[in-house]
Amino acid sequence: MTSIELLSPLIHDKFRFSTCCSTSSLLYLHASSFFRDRSFGFRQNPNRFVSNSSIQLPQSVPGSINQERFNLWQGFSRKKSTSSSRTIVNCQEGDQKASSSEGEGKTNKDKGRKQGKNELWWSKGKKWQWKPIIQAQEIGVMLLQLGIVMFVVRLLRPGIPLPGSEPRTQTTFMSVPYSDFLSKVNNDEVQKVEVDGFHVLFKLKDDGNLQESETSSSSIKLSESSETMLRSVAPTKRVVYSTTRPRDIKTPYEKMLENNVEFGSPDKRSGGFFNSGLIVLFYIAVLAGLLHRFPVNFSQSTTGQLRTRKSGGPGGGKVSGDGETITFADVAGVDEAKEELEEIVEFLKNPDRYVRLGARPPRGVLLVGLPGTGKTLLAKAVAGESDVPFISCSASEFVELYVGMGASRVRDLFARAKKEAPSIIFIDEIDAVAKSRDGKFRMVSNDEREQTLNQLLTEMDGFDSSSAVIVLGATNRADVLDPALRRPGRFDRVVTVESPDKVGRESILKVHVSKKELPLGDDVNLASIASMTTGFTGADLANLVNEAALLAGRKSKMTVDKIDFIHAVERSIAGIEKKTARLKGSEKAVVARHEAGHAVVGTAVASLLSGQSRVEKLSILPRSGGALGFTYIPPTHEDRYLLFIDELHGRLVTLLGGRAAEEVVYSGRISTGALDDIRRATDMAYKAVAEYGLNEKIGPVSVATLSAGGIDDSGGSPWGRDQGHLVDLVQREVTNLLQSALDVALTVVRANPDVLEGLGAQLEDEEKVEGEELQKWLNRVVPSEELAVFIKGKQTALLPAQASSS
């Protein structure tokens, strides 16, 4: 249950914004970072693998042992390529591709050989140098190729085991004629036979004793050299004979059954097509995981080459992800900030106009503003308007687990910008790496962040004066930035991107309506909608237009009417009305009187203060934001930048009007419905006493600054002091102010009992009252004398009890 007033922001919000001390949530841009190149060379000598210790026998011997030799060789060499002509760079691509900062953009062959990836790890001067030999992507390629080789080998030679198969006793394969196999079967010398089509493998019964095998095998006569080789391996290996069955001869299964010979097909568990396929799939999965973690753009001629595009050129330099080009015509409501950046773009396009007058471009421009005000949109407009390379990065991409990686990326980033000068570097959310190093905003020291910041400071102050490289930084926390980064020479300009005023909001609405080609109804006036949206940022207005279009489409309308925009504003402020959750019984009656109390007190305040808006709508339909009721007071038609003391007192009384109505109607039996009202009133009263200096006892003192011990050059407090007695005094004054506001609200409610009860009953029945029906009741409201005294600032002697106590 809340009372929501769309009045202009309070003065303290404006002051905090102007000093860039807002701690609002951050606005993140999907950007990227550069990753430092590492050139490498990889040459692997051929490795020879003799499967199962095959033995080379003379070809003249009929039973010569078949030799199995496999030569595996892997080599990787990559060629350098020149940088492309397109010039919008996303640093995340650079991070994922790891391009060489020293080798890019060189078309000369001699220069291209330097730091090349096809070099060995030693230099031409025969001096050993350590360089990374292999990268994650190439490990995956090696695994994939190795898996393919093993798969092909297993298909060709099914007897060879693959990695992951069951361990086997080392075996020596000997090839013999098929006639010898038949002879051994007939002589009952065969123990086991494995038949795989025309290929037959068999083992003799005396395989355990090599000497016996040699003497009993009459049909297999080996030379002396072969016998010597067999004796050297026989104690640890078994002998398996292989042969090939002719097509017109059958396998002697009857004789093998008669001799109790164990026969069957080969054991496929150690290989076979299925297991080989699983192994290959495993290697492919490993490669896919590596490529997902370290993506590679195969469309480029070089793996580490940064993808570039010409901004604003014929190639369609488009920054946004959907391919849409952003220009300054798409930016509205921030004319001052746009003018500053247009001057920078003009300098890059026509530098002679400024150079002949002795002017130099600003080294850096820092964009500061609340989230949603358009800092990133301005940077995109610069990329779309400028005809120079535009490199965008997020500051968080510079920070890595390993110390030194961030500084390396900063060096690569600025090295590329210098090569392509004139160019622009945009670093979004720069406070991620540029926080103050004095420990005030860092509870724990971080060497990686400090080294990255030091490298950033060095690069920004080390530009050649003739190279037009401009750095754009964006942040909504300028108060935490290191002073060394904000000084002239690094960030020469600090551009504040503020929330738009009424004219700016109208311009923003026109831009979004025209871009979406939104069909508007005849009753839509964008100027009036801009008046209803005081305090909205550019992002809020863009969302408002989209919500209005969605609401119109939900009702199958052909145009977007004014009522759609009004409902969209209400959704943005109070949330979405719940369709199923409805208040019933006593709760519904309490909420109706509560909202009627806000309306009665707010109308009484508006009658005493000129230029104040009146209540236009009451609702007791629960909303998604948790509010059970809704009182809508539109903002004034003109933007307000100051809040006077009488207006502040009037807001306090209006906020506590709902609680006062509950006390009067239900004779002190109050509910918890005033939770949000009390929070907002307490915050407003505390700032009036402790920050605005609107209390006579405290005086014009900033309690926070006094308690902290002053403000240093960076805008923070150097040390803190215990000011317990001052805090107690502030708490007492805040309590007195809130109690006085509640007492005044009670007097207003008691002065208008008929209006309170009649309006509350109608709201309870209809759940929503607005327009002429609401104004009929509110026109009968009469302000009390105590309200007039309180609004004028005469806080003392409001009630007899307070007068006697004072």
UniProtKB/Swiss-Prot annotation:
Keywords attached to this entry? ATP-binding, Chloroplast, Hydrolase, Membrane, Metal-binding, Metalloprotease, Nucleotide-binding, Plastid, Protease, Thylakoid, Transit peptide, Transmembrane, Transmembrane helix, Zinc
Which example biological process does GO assign this protein?
A: proteolysis
List every stretch annotated Disordered: 84-116
- GO molecular function term, any single one: metal ion binding
Q: Does the keyword Coiled coil apply?
A: no
InterPro entries xref list: AAA+_ATPase, AAA_lid_3, ATPase_AAA_core, ATPase_AAA_CS, FtsH, P-loop_NTPase, Peptidase_M41, Peptidase_M41-like
Please tell me which top-level EC class this enzyme sits in. hydrolase
Listed binding positions for Zn(2+) are 594, 598, 677
- In the record's cofactor note, how is the cofactor described as bound? Binds 1 zinc ion per subunit.
Where does it localize? Plastid, Chloroplast thylakoid membrane
State the active site: 595
Cofactor names: Zn(2+)
Question: What topology does the record note for this protein and the membrane?
Answer: Multi-pass membrane protein
Q: Which NCBIfam families match?
A: FtsH_fam (TIGR01241)
Q: Which HAMAP family does this entry report, sorted A to Z?
A: FtsH
Record function comment? Probable ATP-dependent zinc metallopeptidase.
Q: What protein name applies here?
A: ATP-dependent zinc metalloprotease FTSH 9, chloroplastic
Q: Taxonomic lineage per UniProt?
A: Eukaryota, Viridiplantae, Streptophyta, Embryophyta, Tracheophyta
Which gene codes for it?
A: FTSH9
